[in-house]
């Protein structure tokens, strides 16, 4: 699938290894990995940030190959999953930052236009998450209350 508001097709990506078993050099147990995930989630880190920390600092290439389940599933099982999905959260955060910028710079027409694009992405993503039941059907994005969602 291509980009929404530009011409890019977005076809480059990293190739996942075919072998689904953990690497032979990895000596970390699944319970230790889950414990690290819980500790990072309690500090307030998002699932993607947890994955980056595990990869870069602890040498765990794929959590799923070690534990058998993904980071978000582990967090959901322990009740630590974020209430708003991560990609939607960061789009809302971006919209709040643009609105704050527009309060100071009222004549910035390009930012007004970009805010419209970001908010249309938010609405489209929210519609998808309501359909897949990751968000409650009554959830609605409102620009006035958005800053409390990301605070």
UniProtKB/Swiss-Prot annotation:
Organism, as annotated: Oryza sativa subsp. japonica (Rice)
InterPro entries: Ribosomal_uS15 (IPR000589), Ribosomal_uS15_arc_euk (IPR023029), Ribosomal_uS15_N (IPR012606), uS15_NS1_RNA-bd_sf (IPR009068)
Matching Pfam families: Ribosomal_S13_N, Ribosomal_S15
Family: Belongs to the universal ribosomal protein uS15 family.
Matching NCBIfam families: PRK08561.1 (NF006331)
Highest taxon, organism lineage: Eukaryota
GO biological process: translation
HAMAP family: Ribosomal_uS15_A
UniProt protein name: Small ribosomal subunit protein uS15y
SUPFAM superfamilies: S15/NS1 RNA-binding domain
A GO cellular component entry from the record: cytosolic small ribosomal subunit
Keywords: Ribonucleoprotein, Ribosomal protein
One term of GO molecular function: small ribosomal subunit rRNA binding
């Amino acid at each position: 699938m291509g980009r929404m508001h530009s011409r890019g097709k977005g076809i480059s990506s990293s190739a996942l290894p075919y072998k689904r078993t953990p690497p032979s050099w990895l000596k970390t147990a699944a319970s230790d990995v889950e414990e690290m995930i819980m500790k990072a989630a309690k500090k307030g880190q998002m699932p993607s940030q947890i994955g980056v920390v595990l990869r870069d600092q602890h040498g765990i290439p794929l959590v799923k190959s070690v534990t058998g389940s993904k980071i978000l599933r582990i967090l959901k099982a322990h009740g630590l999953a974020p209430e708003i999905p991560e990609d939607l959260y960061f789009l809302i955060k971006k919209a709040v930052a643009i609105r704050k910028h527009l309060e100071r710079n009222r004549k910035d027409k390009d930012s007004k236009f970009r805010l419209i694009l970001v908010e249309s992405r938010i609405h489209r993503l929210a519609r998808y998450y309501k359909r897949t039941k990751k968000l409650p059907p009554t959830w609605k994005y409102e620009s006035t209350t958005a800053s409390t969602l990301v605070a």
